[in-house]
Amino acid sequence: MFRVFGSFGSKGNQSSGEEQSTKTKQVLKQANDFEIALKAMDFVLDDRTDEGLNLLKKAEMETGSDQTILTLARGVIEFLQATLSFETEEMKRAAITLGKAEQMSWKSKQNAEKTNFRSSSIYPPGTVYAVTYTESCLLHALLMLFSESMMEAAKALLKLRRAYTMLQDIMVTVKKAERSKNSSSPSPSEKSQESCGSFVSAETTFISVDIPYKLSSEDKSNPLLLEFAEKIYTMRMGRLSGAHIGNTPSFHRLRDDLGLQTTPSQASDRHSVSDDFDLEQATIDEFIHSGANLCYGILQVVLSLLPPAIGAVLSIVGFKGSREEGLRLVWKAIKERNVHGCIGLLGLMFYYDGPFQFTDADFDIPPNDNGSRALNKSRTNDSSLLPGYMDSATLLHPGKILEDALLKARALFPNSALWLLNEAKMLAGKGRLRDSLALMDSIDVNSIRMRQVKSLMVFERAILLVNLHEYNRAADDLISLLDISDWSHALYTYFAGCCYLENWRMTQLGLLNDGKEQFYKERARELIFDAPSLLGKKTFKSKNLPLDRFMLRKVQQFNNMQKKLNLQEPLDSIATSPVHELAYFYNGYNRMTENDLILTKKMLTEYHNPAIDSEDPDQELIRNLLLSLTLRRLGDAERGLALLDDIVLPKIFYIQNGKVKYFKKTEDPWAYPAALYERALFCWKLGGMESLNECREWLLRAQNYAADYELSTRIGMKIKAALDRVENALA
């Protein structure tokens, strides 16, 4: 007997003769086209977009191909390109394709239900197209929200509402199927015997896990069906091992640790695909539950992070998000070896180590044992979460589990700079800045095929170089982005100017002696004060980005100070070094080493110019806020707290009749709620678990400073995430 693999699940009604043979061909064709779509998307994740798109184009031209999944695959590829660059034309193209996929998915779902086309042994007819519909809806809605058009935003909410409702129904079916499968799972020995593929030429019959019903004797011996089923099996096994896109099996490259100098694990030689994945899982079933887990998980996390006022309104119309449940589902999705797992991993990397600091490393509150769940390292078909498995690997602090997931992606996609970049960011998050830089420098950015990934690599390296105070290279990277990305030429230019300004100040303090003092001075003046003129030349969105508006306000401040003090040199009108503000927005203070922090402290306290010596209250507030953070990171939390309590906070709020009253300041509005957030963090660092109630009070004060300012989303989400963590610990 030829066994493609595994059993065929529950039995369905048998058709007779030619009718059933035609039906079986359709079922296998659908599985084949889904495998082609998954392969095409994996090409993109390996920095080989053209190969992926060519594969889709070839498949689309075949008679009888599943145009729905092929169109969605193209839409996902274009979505990844658009969200990595946020460029207008790419976002428009992705939106059009996803809109088509949405319409096609709905029609395919209705047709499958009407004809009772059953391609899964555990899910009702049409379920897979319900998943493609919600996936295209969700991605399309996100693009509409990014457009910043009120009309498009309203349409996006309607799409999200439809996706949310359908996903709720799908998840009921998925959970029911998982419970049924777990209760009937065979023993490991039985599973091993059933999973072994074999071929005996004297008996050319077969069964396939992709066919959800019992085959007729004619179909079992049909050589064309046998060959088609074997092809799908080979495609799936290649995908699971990572060998399907021309790379050698991924386990040969799998490492145990992060960093450029690490070598493949010795255990990789004994590794088997069956160690990680369920070999009896049909392609359609895999797509259904990985897609449902990913989409519903992301939607839940996003809803949970919305500001309270918006969240309360949405909950009235049925939108409610649970961050823990959402994270749990995304973690389940990344266990799958497909594009859903990869997108889920990118989402988790952004959540745990992104610029919004949803999990501030300094706010390391241990999880509440009653409310948190530990992540299980089990296979896909087992229960994905078990309490108490690993104390250090919870939903709050995934630790080594997140690291291992990223290392698997690096092994699977050795040609992609996207995963290398994420490894470098993870190293930086651990304070290993030099190791992170070495990893980034190990690749020639000009060899990166995806322009969007190339621009991300260059920008992230510039941020890292700023944290290392290597401002020459940082400025070079930022200026080079003018030829790579259309995202924000004004911000790139301003940021580069701030780097040159810091170098000029370092030469004045004798900390840098390279004979380029005049060059730094001229470039800083030119780039900082010319940056606003570039705002009208960028191509992204109809409105300026939040950081664009921040930059514009800062340059206006400098110009006003120059007039106020009647200064000849524009650079003397800049008080607190703006590069340190930008470092805060990108989590720099949590990543700097001790030596880097010492240099930051020196630059904040020892440099003087007319603007600094004028002791402008707003500029002093910024300087003292950043200095207090620096002191805390250097281990002098008591002194940092005194600075915050005595000098910074009295300028932000006061207590009247037991109620908090805020000074509504407009000069640097991001700093006021940020200072209240940092006060909560001081409270935690000095008081530990006994101070959680006080931490909560400070975070509520930060959250209630509900002014609309240019960085309100970034700061507000960080505050809400911390508040949720504190309240979870207090529960």
Swiss-Prot record:
It is found in: Cytoplasm; Nucleus. The modification Phosphoserine is found at residues 265, 268, 378, 383, 392. One of its GO terms (cellular component) is cytosol. Residues 1-26 are annotated as: Disordered. Keywords: Cytoplasm, Nucleus, Phosphoprotein. InterPro entries: Iml2/TPR_39. The modification Phosphothreonine is found at residue 380. Pfam families: Iml2-TPR_39. Residues 10-26 have a biased composition (Polar residues). Inclusion body (IB) resident protein that interacts strongly with lipid droplet (LD) proteins. Involved in LD-mediated IB clearing after protein folding stress, probably by enabling access to the IBs of an LD-stored soluble sterol derivative that acts as a chaperone in inclusion clearing. PANTHER family: TETRATRICOPEPTIDE REPEAT PROTEIN 39 FAMILY MEMBER (PTHR31859), TETRATRICOPEPTIDE REPEAT PROTEIN 39C (PTHR31859:SF1). Belongs to the IML2 family. Interacts with lipid droplet proteins PET10 and PDR16. This is Inclusion body clearance protein IML2. It comes from Saccharomyces cerevisiae (strain YJM789) (Baker's yeast). The gene is IML2.
